[in-house]
């Protein structure tokens, strides 16, 4: 658990975070669709965000967090002024109505048992509410992921991730951390 300069605590995911976590996950998915691929890609990402997908995804997140504590971390902002501070509150609301804690981001490294997928640690997702970008919170999330990855028993001492080449902001962030192009991920429809 760490405290960022902006008063945002980075801590392990807890089951009570599920509703707020899901709203951030939606932001992640819709941002991929909207920001990196046009209307067709956005439509595909919107269409997959069904209630069934939500339940399956959150069940998987909880299993991963239980099996490998610390592989899923959240950034939680607390506002004591009663004015809210953006982000997503624990019931999935917009977080602007009171001074309670709000989830403003998350990072998800795959559990150690899944590291054989790439023979390395895998950063599955890192997402931050737009209001908190550029504040240092993403750096705290990345630090937590890297610390966790270093604790895993890995075939190769490396961490990999998938980032869309059109996502300039994310690519610049990962470049700052020394991520280099390593192979090429290709895909096709089933």
Name every feature range the model reports, one short phrase each.
Residues 9-11, 15, 26-60:
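Conserved GNAT-fold acetyl-CoA-binding loop/helix
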Residues 52-74, 78:
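A short helix-loop-beta-strand connector motif used in the catalytic cores of GNAT acetyltransferases and
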Residues 72-74, 100-111, 122, 127:
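Conserved beta-strand in the GNAT
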Residues 118-130, 184:
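Conserved acetyl-CoA binding element of GNAT-fold acetyltransferases
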Residues 121, 151-162:
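Conserved GNAT acetyl-CoA-binding A-motif
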Residues 129-131, 135, 165-166:
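Active-site acidic-Proline motif in GNAT/NAT acetyltransferases
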Residues 132, 136-144:
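Conserved acetyl-CoA pyrophosphate-binding loop and the N-cap/start of the following alpha-helix
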Residues 139, 165-183:
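Conserved active-site alpha-helix within GNAT-family acetyltransferase domains
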